[in-house]
């Protein structure tokens, strides 16, 4: 089951699973926490969407997300601290990025969006090619996405357009 903000179910699947459309919006953090605490729910992971780097999407999540897709680390490590990222294999290959590189994200999914220059990301790892959507993603913590937008970690973004 995929849970997200009100809107088109197709758009929710395209944005939340395949990362091919704009997100439908945010749900309240309290609602997400309640769902995760439900004993009938086996697995949840958050997705904080809305930014990119050179057309590759940045996804704020937790370490359960890459485990769900059974992707392995080829070089370096998973992100551990705010503003650290682990790159999908195609992202690293196409952009020529490696562990230790830094980059500035753009707001939105097209090049030229407003940049988050005050919060550069640091590459800490690169996933091995997996044949999954993770190959095309830049993964980081949800807290990193909040920081990039100048929002205090834990703030409810349900009414925000990020």
Where are these regions (language model features)?
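Hydrophobic, regular-secondary-structure patches
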Residues: 1-57, 67, 81
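Hydrophobic secondary-structure segments that place a key small or acidic residue at a functional site
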Residues: 52-62, 71-162
